[in-house]
């Protein structure tokens, strides 16, 4: 199935080849908490920006391992390109994943999905 979504103004849009998430992830790190994002994770090959990537802004902090993409016009956090961290914060040093803000999916009510909490506040 194809999932589509975009930021509020539509300048940052995307397409995912995959299923709607069975669960979402809420990270408690300072950045994710302030953004209010609910993450759905996909393999990089499943995710495709449908608007020019050059239009996105990217924020990196702390270890600089995670690229947080957001729309420079409306400010919505759209997706991250990050290591495929395990819930305990470990990483195999090569596998990456795309975390997509499920609140931006078209035709999906994110609050209806179960949420897993990652203790990002204490992990990184």
Residues of each region from the PLM?
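A short Gly-Trp-Pro
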Residues: 1-6, 11-124
């Amino acid at each position: 199935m194809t999932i589509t979504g975009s930021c509020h103004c539509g300048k940052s849009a995307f397409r995912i080849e995959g299923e709607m998430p069975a669960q979402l992830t809420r990270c408690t790190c300072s950045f994710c908490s302030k953004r209010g994002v609910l993450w759905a994770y996909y393999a990089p090959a499943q995710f495709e920006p449908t608007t020019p990537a050059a239009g996105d802004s990217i924020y990196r902090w702390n270890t600089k391992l995670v690229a947080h993409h957001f729309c420079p016009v409306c400010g919505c956090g759209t997706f991250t390109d990050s290591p495929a961290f395990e819930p305990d914060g470990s990483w195999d040093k090569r596998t990456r994943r795309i975390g997509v803000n499920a609140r931006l999916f078209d035709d999906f009510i994110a609050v209806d999905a179960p949420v897993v909490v990652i203790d990002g506040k204490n992990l990184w």
